[in-house]
């Protein structure tokens, strides 16, 4: 009986550890990947940067990408 209880507790501990580790290791998005629906999922050295899309002065949407922190992107003509 003690062996069954001990085995159950050990299995419970192992499953809990696996679940906690999976949460800590959530998949992060690499550079230039779209993060519109998941702004917090960019890799640690990246930030989710969003830009509005406009057509004839009216906003038609928003795009977000994982970009390097501290880097300023400028439009080229």
UniProtKB/Swiss-Prot annotation:
Coiled coil: none annotated. It holds the Pfam family Toxin_35. Expressed by the venom gland. Transmembrane segments: none annotated. GO terms for cellular component: extracellular region. Residues 21-26 form a propeptide. It comes from the Eukaryota. InterPro entries: Spider_toxin_CSTX_knottin (IPR019553). Residues 1-20 form the signal peptide. GO terms for molecular function: toxin activity. The keyword Flavoprotein does not apply. It is found in: Secreted. Keywords: Disulfide bond, Secreted, Signal, Toxin. The keyword tRNA-binding does not apply. Its main location: secreted. Contains 4 disulfide bonds. Belongs to the neurotoxin 19 (CSTX) family. 08 (U8-Lctx) subfamily. This is U8-lycotoxin-Ls1c.
